[in-house]
Amino acid sequence: MTREKSLALLITLAAALAAAESPPGRCHSPKTVGPCRASFHRWRYNATSQMCQEFIFGGCKGNANNFVSKQDCFQTCIRGGAAEATVVPSGPATEVATPRAGHLPEAYENRPGFREFCAAPRVVGPCRASFLRWYFDLESRMCKMFIYGGCRGNKNNYLFEEHCWSQCTGDGEITEEPGDAGAQPPLPSEPFSFSTRAVVLAVLPAILVTILLGSMGVFFVKICRKNPELSVGTVWSTLDDKEYLMSNAYTL
């Protein structure tokens, strides 16, 4: 009996070790680009090759096998890290928080600019682009990811998670986020695009009407030149009336 118990214990331990070493279920999800047309470089775990591979993510409707960095993919799926890595949101305006070890420091709310850069609510904006951005959630005191439409946002909108944390949970000076080579190119202002479209829609019909009227004018001029009697009628004067009456009198 003792031998059988030892054997059963070894089998149980082996099964537990195998389960611990196997990647989480999210790592077995297939590659999903998504229907949106953005172009973000992301990483996924390939269960066949057992390696983390880079792919292009469209920006929405992805799955959990979607990591911001190769290190996140490696720690989660290959090393089997306990902490979940940052996941790209699966739909527009979906919040994703990145867990941090330990307690977050208290936000220094009395600092100049804190209300603009950290306490302002998340603003997606009316435009329909799909840019991954970060904002500081005052209630949870965490930096969260969201999808930014591309225009009419506010200052609680960061390109990088690290800058969000340093701005809103540190004790340094709050400043504008510096530009970076990997940042998205600035979009043209929405009023300008709408005004240009309105001008084109207003001018184009006027041009078409002008061309049509000009063509009709040329057409009628050509007809009048071919048939002069249509344009210049016979002039009837009083002398013609007298001659007509005299000829009738002689006839009688």
Curated annotation (Swiss-Prot):
Expressed by the venom gland. It comes from the Eukaryota. GO terms for cellular component: extracellular region. One of its GO terms (molecular function) is serine-type endopeptidase inhibitor activity. The keyword Glycoprotein applies. It is found in: Secreted. SUPFAM superfamilies: BPTI-like. Residues 27-77, 118-168 form the BPTI/Kunitz inhibitor domain. Glycans are attached at residue 46. The record marks 37-38, 128-129 as: Reactive bond for trypsin. Disulfide bonds join 27-77, 36-60, 52-73, 118-168, 127-151, 143-164. Its main location: secreted. Residues 1-20 form the signal peptide. Serine protease inhibitor. Belongs to the venom Kunitz-type family. PANTHER family: KUNITZ-TYPE PROTEASE INHIBITOR 2. This is Putative Kunitz-type serine protease inhibitor. It comes from Austrelaps labialis (Pygmy copperhead).
